[in-house]
């Protein structure tokens, strides 16, 4: 261990190598608190060259490496399992100037999402992806998981925002792909290879991101419904609006908990809610009102046309994860279902949970336009049984088991519920080509059967 520590310190300096047991335990536990691994050291490199050197040190010694960003993931994607070296990207925090003409900005892997939003706003632009953990989630991790979030219906996932990137491959080679023109058909779209690869194919060190114009007007509405199918149908109608920014599904019980937690005056009392936001160069209030009248919700919607009102409504949505966490670490699902199957899946999943764990409480929220749901099960003692049963239901209803959180280590042995054997074999062939010793993010994505 001392030899490894000294070799790591030769690269980054002794102050940036940590072997304290308490620190390593904290850094080896994921955000949910459900999953803890084991690591032998934490290193915090300053730049791409140091990352390349660190990877060479670890690879040559046969030491696994787990890459960590903001550690906001929910599928144990940064939890080490093999006494790994933890490689943190937190010091890769440089952020470039906004290129107004091209609508782009370059951010280091350790830059937080909030910092990108701030830099874009200062230049009169915006970044299209947003998530509740924006203050701690980092760009490198968001690219590696192809994060989505609150505005995917309009702007897409991280894949749609990446114009170029720099990555250190498992062999220490650095690849920089940063075309300055939008029309570029010269060879493979290499950046796409690392978007969503969850650190298994290399360490993303910086990213060129697309920025957008800020719409002049914004209207936010919280609408109550009696059934989930009503929410789905309302989402279909509202999605036809020009400039729809968000269509968020909220479980009525969760909204009540959020309202109490925030001590906020938001509508409650209905089983289901839809948080809709529209922004455009023209005032969309009249268009939204017309569609709401056509939908005919059972109670008058709350509508906000100013920033404070919008912030109040969004606060209730954004604290959902925090609120459900107050009852202990929930069992979390992140799945996408065809819209036609969303309501029936929810009914079936609720029944399965009730039969496997009668004392458990399911709370649902998500992004209804994409059929992306976050099912949180509170007080669930039979977690393993419930987990597989619900994921099998996802498959049976035509969905996928990982919509935006990634596979991580939590879902690696359920990958066959979403992908064919040939899909997995092709991905594994790419992994083996770039990382033949399988030392980088070894616990992530691929089923145990491939590794034994």
Where are these regions (language model features)?
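Noncatalytic alpha-helical scaffold of FAD-dependent oxidoreductases
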Residues: 1-452
């Amino acid at each position: 261990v001392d030899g490894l520590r000294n070799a790591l310190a030769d690269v980054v300096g002794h102050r940036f190598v940590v072997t304290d047991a308490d620190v390593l335990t904290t850094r080896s536990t994921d955000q949910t608190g459900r999953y803890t691994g084991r690591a032998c050291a934490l290193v915090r490199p300053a730049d791409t060259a140091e990352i390349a050197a660190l990877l060479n040190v670890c690879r040559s010694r046969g030491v696994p490496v787990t890459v960590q960003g903001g550690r906001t993931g929910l599928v144990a994607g940064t939890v080490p399992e093999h006494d790994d070296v933890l490689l943190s990207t937190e010091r890769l925090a440089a952020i470039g100037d906004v290129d107004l003409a091209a609508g782009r900005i370059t951010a280091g892997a350790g830059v937080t999402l909030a910092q990108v939003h701030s830099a874009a706003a200062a230049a009169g632009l915006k970044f299209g992806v947003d998530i509740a953990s924006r203050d701690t989630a980092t760009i490198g991790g968001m690219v590696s998981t192809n994060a989505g979030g609150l505005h995917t219906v309009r702007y897409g996932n991280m894949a749609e925002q990446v114009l170029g990137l720099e990555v250190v491959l498992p062999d220490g080679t650095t690849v920089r792909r940063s075309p300055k023109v939008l029309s570029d058909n010269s060879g493979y779209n290499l950046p796409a290879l690392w978007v969503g690869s969850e650190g298994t194919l290399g360490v993303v060190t910086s990213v060129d991101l697309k920025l957008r114009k800020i719409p002049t007007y914004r209207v936010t509405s919280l609408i109550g419904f009696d059934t989930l199918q009503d929410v789905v149908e309302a989402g279909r109608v509202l999605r036809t609006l020009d400039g729809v920014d968000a269509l968020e599904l909220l479980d009525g019980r969760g909204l009540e908990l959020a309202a109490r937690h925030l001590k906020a005056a938001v509508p409650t009392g209905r089983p289901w809610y839809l948080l809709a936001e529209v922004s455009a160069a023209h005032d969309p209030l009249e268009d939204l009102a017309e569609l709401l009248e056509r939908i005919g919700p059972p109670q008058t919607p709350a509508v906000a046309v100013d920033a404070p009102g919008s912030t109040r409504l969004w606060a209730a949505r954004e604290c959902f994860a925090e609120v459900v966490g107050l009852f202990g670490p929930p069992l979390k699902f992140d799945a996408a279902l065809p819209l036609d199957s969303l309501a029936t899946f929810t009914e079936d999943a609720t029944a399965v949970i009730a039969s496997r764990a009668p004392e458990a409480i399911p709370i649902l929220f998500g992004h209804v336009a994409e059929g992306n749901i976050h099912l949180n099960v509170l007080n669930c003692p039979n977690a393993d049984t419930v987990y597989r049963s619900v994921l099998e239901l996802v498959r049976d209803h035509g969905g996928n088991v990982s919509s935006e959180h990634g596979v991580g280590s939590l879902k690696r042995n359920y990958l066959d519920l979403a992908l064919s054997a040939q899909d997995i074999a092709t991905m594994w062939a790419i992994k083996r080509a770039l990382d033949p010793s399988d030392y980088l993010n070894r616990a992530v994505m691929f089923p145990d059967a491939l590794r034994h």
